[in-house]
């Protein structure tokens, strides 16, 4: 057997082991997701607001527009104002296949103009002591959202290939853990901070192992990600203490007070939990990119010392800091555009703005998340310098 054949067999065995590892990892991740999805969270307690038990939201199709008295809005000619009378066939719910007549009022705040053949989401009010009442809630956006997600997935797979598929699996796992573990767990009164930290650690582990098999590069990226997210959370905790911020200062905090009284939801930690979740993706991006770059440098020059590798990581990381810092800060600023315009219309003074809960939360969260990325560069460089041993050639 020639040396070339021997090397080919070794590569095949290595690829087979990696494939088996990914299959087992995906199966374990799927079982974890199904366990979270199937758990009876309501057994821990449930809050239900008053006067909503009779409300149901179902899909309906416009069979006929009986009357349309709408006119273009003077402020935005693309929108219409007025009233429509619609005959709608209910496609779901207790009254499925029933046709109902609905008066659809179009205002500047509720503006859903429907045409024959379109589907919409209908609010179906079925009180015990009165007749059913129907209103148009909104457009049925689910099909378009599915197409958008499908286009995103297709682009990731087309460009990323097999690694793109694994990327989507990791993204789906993280989304499922947030939707079916972190949110219901916090809602039902479980300790929000330990729950979030543990869940995000699992998400980091699964996402990185789906991209790369166990190796020093993977462990370096994982440790760096967890350290960067922890630092972002620690920095925000310091900021929130200095600024006297908690979940009660959030715009939705007041509405969650009643929920907290019945389910044990921990309002105090909600802002910190939000920072941990929002910073995870950016910190993981920097950690894995830098760990991969330093791994390639070590492969190219196996004699590099740990100090040289650390210095190289800092040089590479400075460019990442510039781009990722802009990404995070601009993301938070983009969310604030409409609010800031509204505050300008109200004639707010700068001192009033800086003293507001809104500005304090936005600045503290944006800076804390960005610092998690910035501090992730020396952390990743140091961990890689410690884990990447000189190569023996």
Q: Model segments located where?
A:
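Structural detector for short beta-strands of small beta-barrel domains
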Residues: 53-82
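Helical hairpin unit composed of two closely spaced alpha helices linked by a short loop
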Residues: 280-288, 294-340, 347
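Loop-to-transmembrane-helix entry motif
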Residues: 14, 188, 192, 313-328, ...
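Pore-lining and gate-forming transmembrane alpha-helices of multi-pass membrane transport proteins
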Residues: 224-225, 229, 260-277, 323, ...
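Transmembrane alpha-helical segments that form the functional core of multipass membrane systems
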Residues: 150-157, 162-258, 265-278
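Extended, hydrophilic extramembrane loops/domains of integral membrane proteins
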Residues: 106-143
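Hydrophobic secretory-pathway targeting helix
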Residues: 1-50
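Hydrophobic alpha-helical transmembrane segments of membrane transport and translocation systems
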Residues: 319, 331-393
